[in-house]
Every structure is written in C-alpha cells, then in structure tokens.
From Swiss-Prot:
A single GO molecular function term of this UniProt record: ATP binding
UniProt organism field: Campylobacter jejuni subsp. jejuni serotype O:2 (strain ATCC 700819 / NCTC 11168)
PANTHER family: DNA REPAIR PROTEIN RECN
An annotated GO BP: double-strand break repair
Annotated ATP binding sites: 29-36
Identification of the protein by name: DNA repair protein RecN
Any one cellular-component term (Gene Ontology): bacterial nucleoid
Keyword presence, Nucleotide-binding: yes
Length: 507
C-alpha cells in the first residue's frame, strides 16, 4: 500500500505531498487542472509512465520481492525518481535499472491502460476454473499437484530424448573424437610426478661430461692415502678420521659416476616432449588423466545410446499416456465450471453496463503444465481488439472483480485512468460499486469525472490550478460535498446539486 507521495517541479506542480490511507483514492478537479500530470507523476516513480517531474518519492509498505532485483528490502520501501540530465530510479536509495523497475512494479501494480491485455491471459482463466473446482472438491488440489509433477518429469525426459536425437546425428564424429583422445593419452600413459622427475634427470645429464672430468682429477687423492696415514702415525695422531673422510668421499665419487644414467638420451627427450604435449593441451598430467576417464565414459555412453534411447522412449510414452488421461479429466472438470465462471464475469459486466461475454474452451493438441485447454473470450461476438479503451478497461475491472470474488483474495495497487469518462450517472454508479468491492482487496487510485465514483472514495483529493500553478489538497467531508455538487452542476452550484451530493455521500 502507498502511504505517502511527494513530488517537486512537475510542470504546474512546484511541490505536492499527499498522505494516503487504504481503499479507494480519487483525484477530481476542472479539466486542465493537472490531474493527469499528477497521476502520471505517481506512476513514473514505478517506471510505468513518463513524467516531467524532477523528483518523485513514494513510500510503499507492502512486502516486495526486492532481493531478486538486488535491492535490500525494508519495512517501508521508498521508490524515488530523480531527473536531471537523465532520469534515475532508486529503491531505498539503491539504484535500479528502468526495465528492472518496470518488471518489479508489475508484480504488485495493475495499471489499467489501453496498451496491455494481460488480465485476460489463458493461465488466469484456467486458474479460476480450477479454483471453482477446489471449492467443491478438496482432492482436486493434490490432483493438480500430481499433474504438474508428472508434467515436469515428462518435460525432463523429453529434453533428454531430444539431446540423444541431436547426439545421434553426429554420434560417429563424437565417437572418433573420443577414441582419438583416449588413444593419444593412453599411448603416452603418463604418471603423476613423472614429468618433474625427468626434468631433474635431464638437468643431470647435461652436466655428465663435466662431472666425470672433475671427479677423474679428484680421484688422485686416493693415491696419497697410504702416505698421509703413515705421516699421521709417525706424528702419533689417530688416522681414523682421515680414513673415514676418504671412505665417505669414495661413496660420493661412485654415486657421481652416473653408472645409472647409462641409457638412451633420445628416448628420455622423446618422453619429456610427449608429456609436455599433454601438459600444454590439458594444463596438467592430472587433468589429462581426468579427460581420459571422461572420454572413456563418453565413448561408453555413445555406444549405449540406442539402449538409453529405448529406455527413455518407454518412460516417455508411459508418462505421456498418464498425462493425456489426466488432461482429459482436467478438460472435463473445466468445462463443467465454465458456465459458472462466465456467469460470475457477466454479473459484473452487467453492473458495468456492458454486454455479456462468452467463454469457450478449446482443446489443443500440445500438452503443457496447464493441460491442453485454452479459453477464448468474446464480448457480444466481438474480439478484444475491437473494443474501445473504455470498454476494455471496464472488462478488465470485471475480470479483476471476478478473480477476487472466486479466490476471495487479491493484493496490490490498482491504477485506473479516466475510468468513468463519458459515462452516464447510472454507469458511473455501477463502476463505483464494483470499485468499492475491489477496495477491500486492492488500494485503488483513479481520476474521476463524475460524483458517483468520487462519493465512494476513502481518500478524495482536489486538483486546482491558479494561474500557471497547480495544487492538490485532501478534502474533508464538507469540502467533498461541495466538490461533488460542483461535479453535478458545474461552477454555479445549485441547492439541488448540494442535496444530491449529500445523498450520494450518505449512501
């Protein structure tokens, strides 16, 4: 629900601030006073209309799914429009793109303009027919849940089958690609850590000649061993330390002779090159081994494709048969309730001085999560596109009222532009009664030209223009009677108009 509206520099409005309560809110005033300017200014904060306002700020206390749009929700969410060179939109001081704001706004605001017919979507009609059945048959809820569960399983298997059919078209090529990778990796047969070990070995090999020459010279020390020991003994010094040192040196010398490196250097280099190829292609030996495992699995999958296809086709046909049977039950149930829905809708259309609508159920070949049914709506054999904008808005109103009546629920904000324009008093009163009923579920904003609708309002705002400046103020009871009388008789208010206004107000 909108609690507060604030705007600045909106054409004739230098500043406007409105405190709003729940129910029906109407804006009245002379032609050209700025009602539409104010109305569009409010809608512009939700990106549902264009406006010249520099600032619009609206407080909404509904729980909204702002997190889906990357906005943190608060108890009171503040929608703000700022216009300088460009128009910018904010919710709770967090920036939001125009299109995202539009999509969000449509989840809790219904704007009855001539541009959209989304009230008459097939899904909405089917949901109402199903709701009528639920009122009589409590088991129908679980039936619908089972149908949707079966349809989701059916869709998943259908997608898997389509994927297999696509694979079959290029399965031989995929097999060859998988075999080629398996053969390449398997022929190299890499081991984890092997590449690093071979690089160390290669480094040692590159120093082999220098090492052999150096140790060949160093071995001459062993020829002096006896001479040194004899000198130590004559000097009465224990020679064991020298013997131990030379023994350790002999071990090092033997190890450095690289007798273990006496193998094919070309083979070593080829091995390093093959392992290097795998590392370049797969980033690591570990990844190459993982790819080998994956490609073996894929090859097995391709070779078992026909078996998988048969199994899926069997499940697909079983589920399709099950869904067809349930869809028939759905169709029969909806046909049974179709006249009841049509009657409810036509009761509201009659109240709105419109001709009866006819609803027909068409059964489609293709099955969906809603079944196979499509509801066709006609007004006195005329298609929706042939209705005037006024008729279309009243039809929308009748449908929303029907929805609230059947579901005993409704939530959000309803904006009605020129809903009672060019109507008789009787027609305006009928619309007023429907809106009064809807205001139990929705917060409603409307521009009103006739006293019948305005008399039913919970909030009545008068828009006036003095010179070039427009102003808006909330009317008290006495001011409302005067404004209703003006709407009846014009600027020269008669006593009869005052009495009529009082009667409207009392009723």
């Amino acid at each position: 629900m909108i609690n507060r509206i604030f705007m600045k520099e909106n054409l004739g409005f230098k500043k406007a601030e409105l405190e709003i309560s729940k129910g029906l809110t109407v804006f009245t005033g002379l032609s050209g006073a700025g009602k539409s300017v104010l109305f569009k200014g409010i809608l512009s904060a939700f990106s549902l209309s264009e406006s010249e306002a520099k600032i619009v700020e609206i407080e909404v206390d509904d729980k909204l799914d702002l997190e889906s749009f990357g906005i943190e929700s608060e108890e009171e969410n503040v929608f703000k429009l700022l216009k300088e060179k460009n128009t910018k939109y904010f919710i709770n001081n967090q920036s939001i793109a125009k299109k995202s704001l539009q999509n969000l706004s449509k989840t809790f605001i219904k704007y009855l303009s001539a541009k959209e017919n989304n009230e008459f979507g097939n899904e909405k009609f089917l949901n109402l027919l199903d709701a009528l059945e639920m009122q009589e048959n409590t088991n129908f809820v679980s039936f619908l849940e089972d149908f949707k569960k079966d349809f989701n399983a059916y869709s998943q298997i259908s997608n898997e089958l389509n994927a297999i059919l696509e694979e079959e078209k290029k399965v031989e090529e995929l097999k060859e690609l998988a075999r080629a990778q398996i053969e390449k990796i398997s022929s190299i047969n890499p081991k984890i850590g092997e590449y690093e070990e071979l690089l160390i070995l290669k480094k040692k090999l590159s120093k082999k000649d220098k090492l052999e020459e150096a140790w060949s010279k160093a071995e001459r020390i062993f020829e002096l061993e006896k001479v040194v020991i004899e000198a130590l003994n004559l000097s009465e010094v224990d020679a064991s330390f020298f013997s131990e040192c030379l023994n350790e040196l002999r071990v090092i010398c033997e190890n450095q002779k690289m007798e273990d490196l006496d193998f094919d250097v070309e083979a070593l280099l080829d091995r390093i090159e093959n392992l290097s190829y795998l590392i370049k292609r797969y980033e690591s030996i570990e990844n190459a081994l993982e790819v080998l495992k994956q490609k073996k699995y894929e090859l097995e999958h391709y070779e078992n494709l026909s078996f998988e296809k048969k199994e899926l086709e069997k499940k697909f046909q079983e589920l399709k048969q099950k869904l067809e049977e349930k869809a028939q039950i759905l169709t029969q149930t909806r046909k049974k309730n179709l006249k009841k829905l049509e009657k409810c809708l036509n009761n509201y259309l009659k109240d709105l001085y419109m001709k009866d609508a006819s609803l027909t159920l068409k059964e489609n070949e293709k099955i969906s999560i809603l079944g196979k049914d499509e509801i066709m709506l006609d007004i006195n054999l005329a298609h929706l596109k042939n209705l005037s904008s006024g008729e279309l808005n009243r039809l929308r109103l009748a449908f929303i009222a029907t929805e609230c009546n059947i579901l005993n629920a409704g939530k959000g904000i309803l904006f009605l532009d020129e809903i009672d324009a060019n109507l008789s008093g009787k027609e305006a009163m009928s619309i007023a009664k429907v809106l009064e009923e809807l205001s139990k579920f929705y917060q409603i904003f409307a521009i009103s030209h006739l006293p019948q609708l305005s008399s039913k309002a919970h909030n009545h705002f008068l828009v006036e223009k003095n010179g070039e400046e427009s102003k808006v103020k909330k009317l008290d009871q006495e001011e409302r009677i005067k404004e209703l009388a003006r709407m009846v008789s014009g600027e020269l208010v008669s006593d009869e108009a005052i009495e009529f206004a009082k009667t409207l107000f009392k009723n």
